[in-house]
Design a protein with these regions (language model features):
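Formylglycine-dependent sulfatase
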Residues: 1-174
Length: 174
């Protein structure tokens, strides 16, 4: 595919809910206008499944395209020594590497949780992740900014959105 026809790709991973929990898939009890907007203006997956509906193995499967029995992340990586030392998918090819090889500019902003989070992973031009694991939604936050420990104060959603928007604005024109 030529560069002129190559689509932009922006992925939002959300945690801890089933498809049935979102209004865009028919739930009328939940109000989520931003997710509804994204679903109506982008690609909406209507036949997608996870091999393991738990945070860490689901993320590892998304990034590698492999099953937990293949990539080795079988359960949630606890916010403890395990999250700091578990190699997770560090030694495996991830989707960001493949996209980089195809000429894309890649970034991760937010929760990695498929291996150690403090150091940037192969394939990502930009890396802004939780230092270890997700923190309270408001207050002092610890992040890994390109591998450097930084602390920020505020709402997680605002801090992460600002980082993502900066990455999108600062990337080279293509």
């Amino acid at each position: 595919m030529s560069d002129a026809r190559r689509p932009n790709i922006l992925v939002f991973l959300t945690d801890d809910h089933g498809q049935w929990a979102l209004p865009t898939y028919g739930n009328r009890e939940i109000i989520a206008p931003n997710i509804d907007y994204l679903a109506s203006s982008g690609a909406r997956m209507s036949n997608a499944f996870t091999p393991c509906p738990v945070c860490s193995p689901a993320r590892a499967s998304f990034f590698t395209g492999r099953l937990p029995s293949q990539h080795g992340v079988h359960d949630w990586l606890r916010e403890s020594e395990q999250a700091l030392t578990h190699p997770g998918i560090d030694d495996q090819t991830n989707i960001a590497e493949l996209l980089q090889d195809a000429g894309y500019h890649t970034g991760l902003v937010g929760k990695w949780h498929a291996a150690r989070s403090a150091e940037p992973k192969r394939g990502f031009d930009r890396w802004f992740s939780y230092q270890v694991a997700q923190y309270p939604h408001f207050g002092e936050q610890n992040f890994s900014d390109q591998g450097e420990h930084v602390q920020r104060t505020g709402h997680q959603s605002t801090l992460l959105t600002d980082e993502a928007v900066d990455f999108l604005r600062d990337r080279p024109d293509d």
